Amino acid sequence: MLFNRIALFAASCAALVSAGPLNFHAGSSKDQPVSNNWNTKEISQAAGLVQQTYCDRSTTKPGLKIGDSTLLFTAGNGDHRQRFNLYHSESLGIAVAIEGTNLTSITSDLHDVKGLPVLPHPRYRSHYPEGTRVMHGFQEAYVSIMDDMVRAIEKYKKEKNEKRVTIIGHSLGAAMGLLAAMDVELRLDDGICKTYLFGLPRVGNPTFAGFVDEKIGHKFYSIINGQDWVPAVPPRALGYQHPSNYLWIYPGNSTNAKIYPGQENVHGILTVPRAPNFYDHQGVYFHTQIGASFGQCPAKVGNM
């Protein structure tokens, strides 16, 4: 299954390269890493909430308790639409967690390999600067849940008298989560409180990455575990660029972590080979496992 996904992605990249160069002028930060001052308890809590999106519906019922959070709403099936769960959390407020790729779903897999950069969706395009491009497949996946997600956020913010909104995602769900976080920030009252994204691939071009920094840079938390290969795709040679700052857990699945400032920092994850497997991508993030369909169901926080 992993080989099939890599082959599909390679074919997509080859098609893009044959279409001509995109943007090779994005910069790379040379700043040295700094000590981790991010809230690891919140990272652990967020990891548990996103793990539950991979669990069977029989274990995903409103009222389910995961750490300090209570499940209020769920939508999507992981096939034609990625699943998202909405929780009320003591630490995170209204927390929306978005599922990553379902390896048994062709539709889900195809979202990962539709690599052409496209304009932002018409519903939110006017909020972005001219020249913004995002990956087709990631945006397609987000748009399929967008209306249900926005309605649910607005409903439960009102019901719970809660202004804080936190967007969480893993893998494909992290890419969708970045688009969702920007959408909520740009179009909804109060915007987002934070976004926690695990194993985030590149989502857009340098214009997009710079706009993310401008709008939510102080609320953006990207976490990379060990030798995870997913944050290396789609490649920069195709015009894609990460926003600034990530937390790198190294060795993988440990609690040793540093923050790497700026966009595409030349230190950190770029200095080690990528592992051609999912062990670090589906790893342990500050004592909480994101194991996808092989992970704990119901999800547990802080027990690894």
Swiss-Prot record:
Active-site residues, Swiss-Prot/TrEMBL: S171 (nucleophile), D228, H281
Subcellular location: Secreted
Sites carrying sugar chains: N102, N253
Reaction(s) catalysed by this chain's protein: a monoacylglycerol + H2O = glycerol + a fatty acid + H(+); a diacylglycerol + H2O = a monoacylglycerol + a fatty acid + H(+)
Signal peptide start and end residues: 1-19
Induction of expression: Expression peaks at the optimal conditions (pH 5.0 and 34 degrees Celsius) similar to that found on the human skin surface.
Enzyme class: hydrolase
Gene Ontology CC annotation, any one: extracellular region
Chief subcellular location: secreted
pH dependence: Optimum pH is 5.0.
UniProt entry keywords in alphabetical sequence: Disulfide bond, Glycoprotein, Hydrolase, Lipid degradation, Lipid metabolism, Metal-binding, Secreted, Signal
Function statement: Secreted lipase involved in Dandruff and seborrheic dermatitis (D/SD) probably via lipase-mediated breakdown of sebaceous lipids and release of irritating free fatty acids. Shows activity against monoglyceride and diglyceride substrates and generates free oleic acid from the substrates mono- and diolein. Able to cleave the oleic acid from both the 1 and the 2 position of the glycerol backbone as 1,2 isomers of diolein were converted into oleic acid and glycerol. Can hydrolyze 4-nitrophenyl palmitate to release 4-nitrophenol and palmitoic acid.
Name of the protein in its database record: Secreted mono- and diacylglycerol lipase LIP1
The organism of origin for this protein: Malassezia restricta (strain ATCC 96810 / NBRC 103918 / CBS 7877)
Lineage of source species: Eukaryota, Fungi, Dikarya, Basidiomycota, Ustilaginomycotina
Gene: LIP1
